[in-house]
From Swiss-Prot:
This is Calcium and integrin-binding family member 2. It is found in: Cytoplasm; Cell projection, Stereocilium; Photoreceptor inner segment; Cell projection, Cilium, Photoreceptor outer segment. Ca(2+) binds at D157, D159, D161, K163, D168. The binding of either calcium or magnesium significantly increases the structural stability of the protein in comparison to apo-CIB (calcium- and magnesium-free form). Monomer. Homodimer. GO terms for biological process: calcium ion homeostasis; camera-type eye development; mechanosensory behavior; neuromast development.
Amino acid sequence: MGNKQTIFTDEQLDAYQDCTFFTRKEILRLHGRYHELAPHLVPMDYTNDPDVKVPLALIVNMPELKENPFRNRIVESFSEDGQGNLSFNDFVDMFSVLSEMAPRELKAIYAFKIYDFNVDNYICKEDLEKTLNKLTKEELTPEEVNLVCEKAIEEADLDGDNKLSFADFENMISRAPDFLSTFHIRI
């Protein structure tokens, strides 16, 4: 007794449990991972809600992200500051949405944000080109990329505006059986 270090208050842990798909133990493990990224920045005591953000450059090098061609976009999509720097809340949100427990609808919202490179709330041909080039490590010719992107828009664009709205995107991924199994990260 007396030797136990308090990282979060019971109220904080309850709040994290209420708004994520994690148990108390998993939240504490996430804090450990967050602390490991920047031990000089991240305190072990979060009972006073410190205003700390771990830089994008440290987060994208986590083993769970470093091989993902969309790592920067993933982190930026969860960053409150829009620069890719993550507070602990942002970090927990990212892992919660990418957990196996998150529903398809929630994953779809963030997948759309990740693929919307120009942040105009549509996935246009240029967004698809960037996505395809990242997925294929730029091994396709410009003509092949163009053909695939045009075909994707033709098949998924329900209202004929030559870009994918969120509704178009959601309809498209509802027909992709592997979406849920590929859009996750284990902690």
